[in-house]
Structures are given as structure tokens and as C-alpha cells.
A protein has these predicted regions:
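Mature, structured domains of secreted/extracytosolic soluble proteins
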Residues: 2-6, 12, 16-19, 23-312
């Protein structure tokens, strides 16, 4: 009699296309010992590069024990990564620090089945950092560099955990809040303000922080509201510091984790609220809309807002 595991592998093979055989030679007896994650990968042709990488990074023993969840990139995912990074497979496998950082970013220190995935919330792998998974025409992972990967197969059982297949290698964040904002043209005035207020080093620190980041249009509207020039605003470091720190929360808060209609305390000390439509009400009862969410950084997350919020 075929095992339930064998039935699953047939389904997964069909999902990945005709001619691709996942988890070959799984055996047919109900009493056959279940393979661990590394053994499972070794018997899966589509994971052969992953196995090479695990061996090169000296992670085989680690992934053979414990209780783990592995988001396993397929060979096609690794091929795409090599093109993206502009390196050969040999060069990647020889870079043990990078390889270790990337591979451990795909591993959770507990078993998380498909049904238990905390959708939209921060997921912390054993490497540190975070990513999120959302249900959007399938399960999508957004990694630390805001790249998106699709989970193509789920709940492949191993003796020491579970494996989910992904079609793109996940990469941990490599830019802090200031560097991330600096790379986005719509935050250029915000970056000028952060530098002028002497807050750059703080927002480059460990964190984590959540920044409700005003766009350039938001700053332009503020200048009109206050009747000052940009130069005047940037020169008023006391006001700048008070206003900017009111946009920073000393914790990582993703969109799905924002407490609705509950006071959110900022680094500045005062609070604001966010309603279910992602509209912020500040201390002066002025409102601002969150227009983009969950821009990930190495030390937190950025949400863009269309109006500068003001403390009392």
C-alpha cells in the first residue's frame, strides 16, 4: 500500500510540470522510516543545487536534526539568483558567509504548516531578520529586500519538520531605513530633514523602528500649511526633531499588525491612532492616509503617508 507521503509527492510532481519527479525513491512501505529534511532534498531532483549549497555551507548536520521549517528554493530559483547577482554557481558556493546567511534565512526554528502560516505578519527565520507571507493568488513571500517569491508546494513532511518549495531565493535585507529611503525618490525631502535634524545615525541603528514616512508632496503641503520655506524648516532643528520623531515607532509594526483605533506611542512621546482604512489621526485631529505599506529594511519597516503628522 502506498503511503500518504507518496500520494503527496505525485500531486506535487504534477504541480511542477510533466516530467519533473519530486522526492523520487521515497519507498512504498508504511513502515519505512521517514527521511529528514536533507535526505528528502537529496532525493528531490529539483532541489539538487540547494543540497550542494547546504553541503558547501556546512549546514547538512544542522538541517538533519531539530524541528524545522525550510522554504526550499528550486534549481530554477537558484539559476535566477545567479543571473540576478551576476555570479557563477561555483562563486556562490565558494562564498560561505553569503551562502550561510542566505540559507539560514530560509529556515524557521519550528514546524509551520501551510495552515499555520501567520499571514501578513513578520516571520523571523533562524538567521534573524524577517519576511512576510501573504495570500494573493497563491502564497507569496516578501523578503527583506522587498522581492517577492511564490510558494509552489507546501507541507512536504520530513522526520524533523516540513518543507515548502519556493520559486525564488529569498534574500535578507541589506539596507537600513535611511539607505532605503535614500534610494526612493519620493522620500528625498524626508532624508534631507532626517540629516538636518541629526537623526540619521539613530535611524541607521539596530532598531527595530517603524517609520511613517511623509512623501515629498506631504512635505510640500506642510510648508504651505506652516507658511515657511523648505530652508526655514530644515534650519529649525528643534521643530524638525519633534516632528520627525513623532513619525517613528520604536518597534517593527507591519500593516497587518497595526493596532486599529488604539493609541500608538511614538519615539517623540506622543501618540496617534490609525483606523481600519489606514487613516492616521494626529494630536491636532489632522488626518493623513497611509498610501504605501510594508517597505522592509534591515532595521524595521517604512509606511508612506500623504501628510506630515504633527504633535501638539
Amino acid at each position: 500500500m502506498k503511503t500518504a507521503f507518496n500520494r503527496r509527492t505525485v500531486i506535487l510532481a504534477a504541480a511542477l510540470g510533466a516530467g519533473t519527479t519530486l522526492l523520487q525513491a521515497c519507498g512504498g512501505g508504511d513502515d519505512e522510516p521517514q527521511r529528514n529534511i536533507v535526505e528528502l532534498a537529496k532525493n528531490t531532483p529539483e532541489l539538487s543545487i540547494l543540497v550542494e549549497a547546504v553541503v558547501a555551507a556546512d549546514l547538512a548536520a544542522t538541517l538533519s536534526t531539530g524541528t524545522l521549517t525550510v522554504f526550499a528554493p528550486t534549481n530554477a530559483a537558484f539559476a535566477a539568483l545567479l543571473t540576478e547577482l551576476g555570479v557563477s554557481k561555483e562563486a556562490l558556493l565558494a562564498n560561505k558567509p553569503l551562502l550561510t546567511a542566505v540559507l539560514t534565512y530560509h529556515v524557521l526554528g519550528s514546524t509551520v504548516a501551510r495552515a499555520d502560516v501567520p499571514l501578513g505578519k513578520a516571520i523571523t527565520p533562524v538567521s534573524g531578520g524577517f519576511f512576510k507571507i501573504e495570500s494573493n493568488n497563491g502564497l507569496k513571500i516578501t523578503d527583506g529586500r522587498n522581492r517577492v517569491s511564490t510558494i509552489t508546494a507546501t507541507d512536504i513532511q520530513a522526520s524533523n519538520g516540513v518543507v515548502h518549495l519556493v520559486d525564488r531565493v529569498l534574500l535578507p535585507a541589506d539596507k537600513d531605513i535611511v539607505a532605503t529611503a535614500s534610494a526612493l525618490p519620493d522620500f528625498s525631502i524626508l532624508v534631507e530633514a532626517v540629516v538636518a535634524a541629526g537623526l540619521a545615525s539613530t535611524l541607521q541603528g539596530t532598531g527595530p523602528f517603524t517609520v511613517f514616512a511623509p512623501t515629498n508632496a506631504a512635505f510640500a503641503a506642510l510648508l504651505t500649511e506652516l507658511g515657511v520655506s523648505k530652508a526655514d524648516l530644515l534650519a529649525n532643528t528643534a521643530l524638525l526633531t519633534k516632528v520627525l520623531t513623532y513619525h517613528v515607532v520604536p518597534a517593527r509594526v507591519l500593516k497587518a499588525e497595526v493596532p486599529v483605533n488604539t493609541a500608538i506611542t511614538t519615539v517623540q512621546g506622543q501618540s496617534f491612532t490609525v483606523n481600519s482604512s489606514l487613516v492616521i489621526t494626529d494630536q491636532n485631529m489632522r488626518t493623513s492616509s497611509i498610501v504605501a505599506t510594508d517597505v522592509f529594511t534591515s532595521n524595521g519597516v517604512i509606511h508612506a503617508v500623504d501628510k506630515v503628522i504633527l504633535p501638539k
